Amino acid sequence: MKLSCLSLALAIILILAIVHSPNMEVKALADPEADAFGEANAFGEADAFAEANADVKGMKKAIKEILDCVIEKGYDKLAAKLKKVIQQLWE
């Protein structure tokens, strides 16, 4: 009698293990996917910041070229005022 109870208990444990194993697999797979998604977001944000910094550098270069052109034309006072305004904007 005890042997049949033991085998019945083992059968129930085996069935429960089989039934619940897909849930455990899903939980095990969810963590790496979430980490990969988080890393992808981090890289995407890093790329966006790098592009924004490149755009700022390009704007500064364009402004410098404009100021050089203004100075060449002989508008030194205007160039000095523009430099002050631009410095205040970048601070």
Curated annotation (Swiss-Prot):
Pfam families linked to this entry? Pilosulin (PF17499)
Residues cleaved off as propeptide: 22-54
Q: Which InterPro entries match?
A: Pilosulin (IPR049518)
Instruction: Tell me the leader sequence span.
Output: 1-21
Compartments in which it is found: Secreted
GO cellular component terms listed in the entry, alphabetical order? extracellular region
The task this protein performs is described as: Causes a significant and dose-dependent histamine release, probably by influencing the signal transduction of mast cells through a non-IgE-mediated pathway. This peptide does not have cytotoxic activities.
Record text on subunit structure and interactions: Homodimer; disulfide-linked.
Q: What protein name is recorded for this chain?
A: M-myrmeciitoxin-Mb3a
| The organism of origin for this protein | Myrmecia banksi (Jack jumper ant)
